[in-house]
Amino acid sequence: MEKRRVGQTKLEIDSLGLGGAPLGGNFVDLGYAQAEELIQTAKNIGIGYFDTAPWYGFGRSERVMGDVLRGSEYILSDKVGRLLAPGPVKNPADFGMVDPLPFNVVYDYSYDGIMRAYEDNLQRLGLDRI
């Protein structure tokens, strides 16, 4: 797999990665087993870069990504600025989501909000690094 350097860093990532929006039910209801199979297939063909976000199914994508990636080598990107607060999603279709987890988004781009989002992301992923 061709690699590309990230900015001025020494980090190199695959030129092709797997995006996690469909894994969270964004625009299509991809069940857990299908999502797990998709991630595993990507790993098996040499993809090592994965991307997810709290927005993707309000945590659904992060949960399955963490479960499948745990214990393997990977590069994972996630997002901050949107915290998830427990509560029913009133109109998931308005967000382009099918069967999201029961959370609502709270926008917070402050330093504390970003750090909280990072910690929350790790918790949903069940991982110790992003």
Q: Residue locations for each model-derived region?
A:
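Noncatalytic linker/hinge segments flanking ATPase motor cores
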Residues: 46, 55-62, 88-94, 116-124
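N-terminal binding-site loop/beta-alpha segment at the start of enzyme catalytic domains
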Residues: 1-86
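Glycine/proline-rich, positively charged
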Residues: 27, 94-130
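Structural motif corresponding to the early beta-alpha repeats
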Residues: 71, 75-111
